[in-house]
Structures are given as structure tokens and as C-alpha cells.
Amino acid sequence: NFKISKGDPPMGIQESGENYLETILILRERNGSVRSIDLAREMEYSKPSVSRAVNILKDRNYINIDEKGYLSLTEEGQKLAESLYERHKLLSECFIALGVDVKTAREDACKIEHVISEKCFEKIKEHYNKNREDQI
């Protein structure tokens, strides 16, 4: 379930790889540290699948693995994970504000965050923030 191909986005990984990075970011914020087993539990993937994905992300310089097996994001991995997480949170908030139930809003935001252009996302963010300010 983790592939890297010629048609990938500029950062060089597909949606599944981006989901791993975002999950590492979230788990680190929540727990302070992250290991492969934590990813497997959180994402409900098998340990071998997570191990393969983690090694690909390490080879691509998105994460580091220390001698005790703890995962950390590289500067590039951190930047990408933060960008994805920002998109996820904002899109979820927008959908919920429009009356979409929380579960559907989060699921759809997770799908869209990977394919929406930077230009389009920035316009949504501008619009959302402007409307929030107008309501205060």
C-alpha cells in the first residue's frame, strides 16, 4: 500500500507516504515519541507494511530512525507533514462549518489534502480566515 512512482507529486511520495508523515507528526505531538509499532497501531497496518514504508521514507530522507527505533521527521519531512496537517485541519473545519458531520468532514479532508493545489488551498484559507474575522 506504499508506492513511489514517476507520476508522484513534486516531493516524491504518494498519498500513503504522506499519511505516514502526517501520522508521525500527530503521534509525536500526542505522545512525545514515535516508533514503528505506534504507527502500526494508529494506522491499523501490519508491522511488515509499516516497516517497508518507514524504510522507504528513511531512504527518501523524510524521516530518521535512531538506534532505539524512534522515528523523527527530517526538515523536509517536517515541512511536508506540517503542510498536510494544516490542510487537513482547515479543510475539516470548513466542511464542519458547512454542516458536514465530523466523521465525513475528516475523511474527505484526508482525501483532498493530498491532491489540492497550493494555489487553491491558499484561496480557501484566505476566504475561511476572512469570514472568521468578519464573524468576531
Q: Where would I find each of the regions flagged by the language model?
A:
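DNA-binding alpha-helical recognition surfaces that contact promoter or target DNA
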Residues: E22, R52, E107
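Residue-level signal for threonine
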Residues: Q14, L73-T74, S117
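Residues within the alpha-helical elements of helix-turn-helix
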Residues: E42, L80, A97
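C-terminal regulatory/oligomerization modules of transcriptional regulators
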Residues: K3, D8, E107-I136
